[in-house]
Each structure stands twice: as structure tokens, then as C-alpha cells.
């Protein structure tokens, strides 16, 4: 799910522009199930999806496999370059934008996700999840690269495993849960270039390994139908080793240069939600985080929502939050390009919006929304290209990002088994 702006504070800190939450839930199937989907796209892009499920009163299992691949090679007119046309006296008489080919954008991604859930039938559910990723991607050169059209390889490979064990308990008026997990990531970045006669020389040979152990506990407690209180606490212990195996010493021999670092991260929050009527609600969140040995100031957030009209289900929402984001270990120590001198980001985010939904059952549904957001961020971290041929993160002193977003969805039933769906989005986001 996509958490816009302030709403990310409910889940985690650091989401100055929002956050993306990845989660799954039991399939709730009886017996065996099989699903297969194939997608075909431009530039010989293929997507394969296979899912096998089994479920009964107590057990739910799901096995999913996804494979995506594409050479992603296409021609385009490069408007970031201009080629000069000369006369016999080497005077510029014309200029044009060249037609170039994207030759380094292929990818092959494999995802395997295994889930097993057991429901005791007495309010407790236990889960075991494993997710494996194998990714092999080429990285295109910059569109402003004026180097000669020689052979090169600019490739990033990744293997990641995420394992989670979970417990959830649901009772009248309250619920709680706990999770524990382990994440392992191996990442390789190789940049080679033809130095002549077909000999490919390594310019960069980066290897990174990340091990993370984490735990999380959360709870919810209801008082009647008007009050909801929540609490959440999570801890992550990261261990990262990043090295470049292609550093040349002054004596001409290769050396391995890199970093080996560890960091603890804690995050805790409490919230209160009050709904005095079915047409109005307000909630407040307070979060605080520890990164290494540094605490953030208190991170507050306030949310308001109200039903303007039940006819058309017209709802207005508004929120405000303060937030902080520490540079990740990848920002600080990734080789090549990491910047150990980065400062943490901080900022305020405001947003407001209105939405509606109308329709007739079995005939059509129409919904839409309009949102405004305004964000002020200090020391924004952004990865930028360098003259050394790779990207590196740096702090931009002050950033003001604002804009509007419009969205509309229409679904029309053409027949009992057929429907036509249309959606549109518009955004205006200067900064």
C-alpha cells in the first residue's frame, strides 16, 4: 500500500515524502488453488506469475513465483545532447539531436515467496514467510555521456532473502502481535569498458553484504466505539560490509578497500484516535527513533477527516507532521559513491484533500479525489552523478516540494461477466 506524506508516520519514521508498505495476508482458500498470469509488453518485456495455494480450517499456505525479463533496447531521440554540423572550414552551420539506442537497460528478476499460516481457532494465528529475490540488471549510461561508442558493461546484481515469523492475537476490544525476522542481501556492481582490442577492463568491482536482524511488537485497544489507542515498537540491527575490489595502489597492485559497519535502529510510537460521530474523526501520533547513538526529537503528526456529504460519499481530509530521516548505511558506506559525511534530513509536511464516490450497483461506479501537499525539507539526501563515473549522495540545503494530484476511476458493467474500467491521474509537482 502507498502511504502519502504524513500518513507514513503511523508506520515508520523517515518517510518525508511518504512510504511504500509491502505486506501479505492469508489467502483464505478452501482446498487447492492454482493461478497463472502472463504479461507481454513493449521492447520484448515478459512477466510470468504462478501461484499455488492450499487451505483448510486451520492451515493456509501460498507459494508464489514471479519472473520478469526484457532486453529493454530501443531507439530514442536524445534531447540532452546536440551534435554540431560543420562546413569545410569547420564552422558550425547546424545542430541536431541525435537518435541513439538504449543499449544497457536489460533486466532479469526472479521472486519466490512462500507463506504458511496456522490459525488455532481461539484468536491466535502464527505465520512463517520467506521471500527470495534474484535480480540481474544493466544500468544505462547517462544521456549526457559524450564518450565514444565503445563496448561497456554497467551491471548490478542482487540476491536477497527475507524470513519472518509472526504471531497475532485478536480478542474483544484489543489485539496484539509480534514479529521477528532476518534479512540477507548480497549486491554486486561491475563497470567494465573496452580499453582496446576487445579487452574489457574493470573500472569498478563493488561487493556489498548486509545482514539485518529485527523484531517488532504492536498492540491496539478500543474503548467503546469512539476511542482507539495503538502502540508500536521495532528494533533493527544492521551489519554491512561494502568493498571495491578494483582499487589500484601506487605500486600498480590491486587492493581491496571498503567499510565494515554495524548500527542499531529503534523506533517507537503511540497514537490516539477519536471519532465522536460517524462524520468526524481526529487522531494524533507521537514517534521517536534511535539511530546508532543519536535520538531524533519527538516526531508528531495530526490527522483530521470529516464527511461533508453522505450523498456522494464526499470526504475531506487534512494532516500535518514533522519528520526526520537518517542516512542509510548504503548512503554512508556503499562503494563506490558512499558519503560518510551526510547529515540527517528533517522537515514538515502538510496536505489536504477531498474525495467522492458514486454509482449504481451492477451498473457503474465513479470515484475521484483531489489532493494538495506542501513539504519543506532541510538537508535533503539525493544521489547525483559525479565526474568519476558513478553516483554519490549529498545533502541539498533546503527543498520546498509542493503540488496537487487528481485521480479518477470509472467502472461500467457491460454484461454480467464483462466490465469496462478507466482511470486517469494528473499531478503538478514543482519543487
Role assignments for model-derived ranges:
Residues 58-61, 123-126, 173-176, 226-229, ...:
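Repeated loop/turn-to-beta-strand initiation elements of outer-membrane beta-barrel proteins
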Residues 155-160, 182, 190, 194-283:
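Outer-membrane beta-barrel transmembrane domain signature of Gram-negative proteins
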Residues 74, 103-109, 122-176, 184-211:
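Flexible loop and strand-edge segments within Gram-negative outer membrane beta-barrel domains
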Residues 275-281, 367, 371-376, 395-431:
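Gram-negative outer-membrane beta-barrel transporters
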Residues 35-37, 47, 97-102, 145-155, ...:
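Extracellular loop and loop/strand-boundary signature of outer-membrane beta-barrel proteins
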Residues 1-3, 10, 14-39, 48-50:
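N-terminal periplasmic accessory domains that precede
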Residues 136, 186-188, 292-298, 306-351, ...:
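Surface-exposed extracellular loop regions of Gram-negative outer-membrane beta-barrel proteins
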